[in-house]
Amino acid sequence: MSEDNLGFVAINYISCTPEYQGRFEELFKSRAGAIDTLPGFRHMHVLKPQVPGEENLVISYWDTEEDFKAWTKSEAFIKGHKRGFEDVKKAKDAGQEPPMTSSFKTYEIITN
């Protein structure tokens, strides 16, 4: 990795209903781990807000943006998100609001 490319970070901002927060935490604590062996993956942190109702953060570190994008199109991505996607689908099929919503932003690391 060159000095010009210190890495890439994706931050997923996940809002959960109060009733779903515990389930969200359990999903990550018992995650499949499929991401751990993918090319370019460095590590991940899952952060719980100190203020109830604020967003959880899932911060993943990658060698390159291309590595991150390859993961989002992989079987490992589908496997790693299957249980959460099923929870959202179940709520929508029942005419309910989803128990969690998410959005993400990406960043280039400029200094260590």
Model-inferred region functions:
Residues V9-I14, H45-A76, G80:
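Short, well-ordered beta-strand segments in beta-rich or mixed alpha/beta enzyme
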Residues C16-P18, T64, E108-T111:
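Non-catalytic surface loops within mature trypsin-like serine protease
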Residues P18-H43, A76, G84:
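Short amphipathic alpha-helical segments
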Residues S2-Y20:
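An N-terminal domain-start capping segment
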Residues M1-L6, H45-P52, K82-N112:
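Glycine-rich beta-strand-turn "strand-cap" elements at beta-sheet edges
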Residues G7, I35-L38, E55:
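A generic structural signal for ordered secondary structure
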Residues T37-F41, D63-S102:
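An amphipathic, aromatic/His-enriched active-site/gating alpha helix that lines ligand/cofactor pockets
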Residues E3-L6, E25, K73-S74:
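Mobile, glycine- and charge-enriched loop segments
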